């Protein structure tokens, strides 16, 4: 059920921020935000995983050379993240911050790295991280707003806090420097717009999310059925679908006209042949899971009954099924907000699994990530060698992959077991 007893000050979160910050909940959230940002900057100052940020350096160099996102090899994603990189590159250029440099001596049989010889400068890395930290904070704010609508102030506060202080979230933005949080932000904005009966904006946001990374595809389909149930009108659903289609078209028209569609889709198409990440096996399952999402959406529309929590749980289960075969660690971040939004008390199990996974992620990334600062003299090579010698024996690929699977299986199993328990209790 939606919480009807939310205070007026909460719904003025974006329109009257000063009043909100003077409230008790506003002060508490502000303190959590400050603590989370301090942790991120401290961790980010010492650790930078050198891939894929090496590609961000190459993309920025392409932009400075007026080659665009796809003019030279280096950028293999759809344009949304590229536009963010373009903005960061402009600011970095205005401030005179160097992008990075080519360091051939880093690659070799006795070197720490064996896959990249392009390192970002400290300033460039921190500029990218700052943008990712802002996305983390915006995700927390949107989670809070959705939580207020669904569950009330106390639950919404803990959703904000768990997301923003979760070590897993911090590792991905501070060390791994991947933009999963941008995809999640757009996904949650789509969900919020649907909750607040704004189908056109929901369509825009879900399209932007899909054009960032494709994990919103199941929510995209499920919201077709949910939008019809919300209004009992095809016009409402048509607004959602049309806004989504127009947004996707606007984003891709320049790419198509320049003949760069292959490059824009390379991240997805290359994964079909990538046996190292397990993504190729996952792609074989996607048509079946997508079919299941269409069936669920149709059943939702035909029944005339749907709750936002049922929509969230169904999306969490379908999305986690694509991650049952262990893939890259950052992909699993999309499951965390879904777990926080599920109404079942058992989602604490999912949170615990994420906390354990955070430890493995930190150990795995940090053993490789300080080479940038050794090169720049930020820390000594002896200190890095000592640090790595302690952590590397703990970094077990077998255990690491096992816990990634545990997270995905838990997100599938917990809501299903809870449904069975509730049915049994009703008898």
Question: Where in the sequence are the language-model features?
Answer:
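Multi-pass membrane glycosyltransferase architecture that uses lipid-linked
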Residues: 3-4, 8-269, 282-427
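The feature marks long extracellular or luminal low-complexity segments
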Residues: 275-279
